[in-house]
Each structure stands twice: as structure tokens, then as C-alpha cells.
């Protein structure tokens, strides 16, 4: 089991990033999110399931751009409540429904959604159990898509253990293993997009996402909060020390 210190590292950083207006917390940002959406052929009227919806930014973007309907699911009630308020504020509450449920046991019938869309969530889940549910609720001819941190090559045990500690329960695979996993789940026409080079300098990515005002706000919060400052340093240290292993990419597969 992860230590309290380790398990709180990402929670502290995520909360801080959201508080200063960062909408997507993965390298590649909104660009890769929407690129993955295009690969899923989302159109007006599509029915999309957003796994681990967080504060609802992806679901809202998809609904706004495509005119699709979205159901978002998340284990966090706080995130679910925030997402609901965001959708209501933007006049999208009739188009988007956020639910506080476990994605391992989806309360939807078979063949319900045109697209099942996940970002940075299944690495914290029982992947086989979760994907069986994702595929089950996807319509024939529909798509399952997932954007995750992946191993560029098999890591050593120390790296695996530290990743598990930082992201409590974290478990990922190499790009090749992810592609094989999609195939094992019965998906075809599997598309892989490896954008690991986006990770070359995490500090630069943060600066670009935050902007001047965001940087000032975060600097002030870190000056006042020693534990938050420590968490940020631990996170940055892990990425900088393991660049040879850490990658990011997305996978899209079609259900026959």
C-alpha cells in the first residue's frame, strides 16, 4: 500500500493546478484530447462515455465542439459535483450527465455508447475488469479510446515501485503491451499515437499551460505551503530521473 506522503503527492498537485485554471493535466493537453476524439469519429448526436471525468473539462469540450451527448463517471463526489456545476453554468446540463459511480461496474446496458473515452484513469484501475465494461457498453462499430502514461521500455523495479507510491495504485504497461491488451479485449483497427517527446521537459510544459498569472499564483501557494512545495519537487524529480522510461500516448480501438 502506498504511504500517506506518496499517495498525496498527485492529489496535492492536481488540486493546485485546477485551482489556477489548468484544464487538462496531462502532457499534450487539449490538443491530444481532441486529436483522440477525432480518431473516434465523434459527430453530432454521438453518445460518449467519459471515464474518470474529473472536473468535467473534457466532457464539456466534446459536447461544445461536436454537439454530442456525454455521460461522465467518476469515483470522486467532489469532482462530480464540480463538473455538474460547470456544465450547468455553460448551459449544457441537458447535454451532459455526470455520475458519481465506479467504472468497474457500469450501470448501462450493452451497446449503449458510440465512444468510451478515458484519460489518465485506467492506470489506477483493474484494467482487465474495467476494459471488459468499456467494451461491453460500446456499440458494435464504436470506439474505445484511452490516453495514458506508458513505459517507453520495461522499467526497473525501483521505478515501478516509486510510480506506484506517487500515484496510489498506479500500474501501466509498455506501448506494445497496451496495444496487445486492446487486441485481447477484442478491439480491432487499433491506432497508437506515441507523443512521449512532449514529456522531455515537464517544467516547460507547466509554464506553457499556466501562463504568467498561473505561475505567480502557484509560486505564492508553494511559498506558503511546505508540503505542497515538497510534493511538486518530488513529482518533478521523478519525471526528470526517469525520462528514459516515461512516455505518453493514446490508443483507439474499434469494437466489431
Language-model features: where?
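Conserved alpha-helix/loop element of class I SAM-dependent methyltransferases that forms part
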Residues: 26-44
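A short acidic, Gly/Pro-enriched loop at the edge of an enzyme's catalytic core
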Residues: 104-115
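A short SAM/SAH-binding and catalytic strip from SAM-dependent methyltransferases
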Residues: 115-126
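Short, glycine-/aromatic-enriched active-site segment of Class I SAM-dependent methyltransferases
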Residues: 149-169
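Short alpha-helix
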Residues: 171-186
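Conserved Class I S-adenosyl-L-methionine
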Residues: 193-256
